[in-house]
Amino acid sequence: MITIDFQKMGGLIPAIIQDHATNEVLMVAFMDEKTLNLTLESGKTWFFSRSRNKYWMKGEESGNTQEVVEVLTDCDADAVVIKVKQNGPAACHTGNRSCFYVRWEDGQWVEHSEPLFDPAEVYKK
């Protein structure tokens, strides 16, 4: 039986989130054992925020939730790929569909996407 190795990175593993239909990488976040279990049990993606030191469910503020379609681990069992159905227009807190909208081009980083929503309107605190 395979067991996910949370010890290599101090209790966390990287979680690569992909669109299940297109395989587009939507985001990368971190999970601990609790958030991986919450994800597997609920069918929604849950993560551990290193900057806020708290658990969060994707879409809890924006409504842009993610429904889990498939979960895979790598050969070392220290990372996961989670294929999801993205609900709402965007996975990124910037309003872009994917967090990977900045491309290295001609010696500089260039944004290649327009936000699909205004984060200031969605994340009012």
Curated annotation (Swiss-Prot):
Zn(2+) binds at residues 75, 92, 99. Binds 1 Mg(2+) ion per subunit. Binds 1 zinc ion per subunit. Mg(2+) binds at residues 74, 76, 78. It is an enzyme of class 3 (hydrolase). It catalyses: 1-(5-phospho-beta-D-ribosyl)-5'-AMP + H2O = 1-(5-phospho-beta-D-ribosyl)-5-[(5-phospho-beta-D-ribosylamino)methylideneamino]imidazole-4-carboxamide. Gene3D superfamilies: Phosphoribosyl-AMP cyclohydrolase. The keyword Mitochondrion does not apply. Pathway: Amino-acid biosynthesis; L-histidine biosynthesis; L-histidine from 5-phospho-alpha-D-ribose 1-diphosphate: step 3/9. Homodimer. Belongs to the PRA-CH family. This is Phosphoribosyl-AMP cyclohydrolase. It comes from Geobacter sulfurreducens (strain ATCC 51573 / DSM 12127 / PCA).
